[in-house]
Amino acid sequence: MLEIRDIWKVFNPGTMDEKIALNGLSLKVEDGEFISIIGANGAGKSTLFNAICGTFLVDRGSIVLDGTDVTRVPEHIRAKVIGRLFQDPMKGSAPGMNIEENLILAAGRGGWLSISSPDERAGFRDRLALLGMGLEDRMKAPVGLLSGGQRQALTLMMATMAHPKLLLLDEHTAALDPGTAEKVLKLTTEIVAEEHLTCLMITHNMQSALDLGDRTIMMDGGNIVFDTRGEERKMLTVEGLLDRFRASSGKKLDNDRMLLSTVKDTPRNFKH
């Protein structure tokens, strides 16, 4: 489904501010796989997502999505087949448009449908009802008036409406309060499972990284230093994961946000 081969990205090359953000990273993702990605700040997690989406072009290497080499394909073209949620709930939807208009835009996936049929509107309401937030009764409400959790749940729905080939979740619950974050995370696992989506999820919650999906990778210095799945992953604890990081990278993970990040009652043992 997704094959990344030896990609490199250097920012400000040849200057005092030179930063090797991606350091020969390779990754193969199978169809329908749900991978959680962890790592300290500056490890290259969001940079990897930006490379996949085409926010910038990599300096070297290739990115192949569903058999098509997209390494040099512009970002707006890739956006038609890649869904992405950001940490900021304000991104991913149009605040000046109402809920229905945002859904119409998402359903068009790059094309504007000026009029929605009664059947389409009914379908939108049915999908919104699944979120359990009462948004199905607020179709004409401006998105800018929604709470952060409501807006992130709506954005999740919008990003998956057209069944993207790849779904990227960039700490999409980090800015929400614990209760809302738990609800959005539960919705995420349900939608990914029901739609059989291929998904990469960045998280700073190490327990979530082990509980959700079927594979966990850890990044450091712009590369993958640890990759676990199957029985090995099932047996891992957070402490064991930290030990494996130290063994793989040769250094201690010193990041308060990761070490202290816990969300109670995280949905466990999510499988496709």
Annotated model-derived regions:
Residues 1, 10-24, 74:
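A short, flexible loop at the N-terminus of ABC-type nucleotide-binding domains that lies
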Residues 38-40:
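The feature captures the beta-strand-to-loop junction immediately N-terminal to the Walker
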Residues 53:
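Helix-to-loop junction immediately C-terminal to a conserved catalytic motif
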Residues 61-68, 226-228:
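Conserved ABC transporter NBD signature motif
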Residues 159-160:
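ABC ATPase C-loop
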Residues 203-204:
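H-loop/switch region of ABC-family ATPase nucleotide-binding domains
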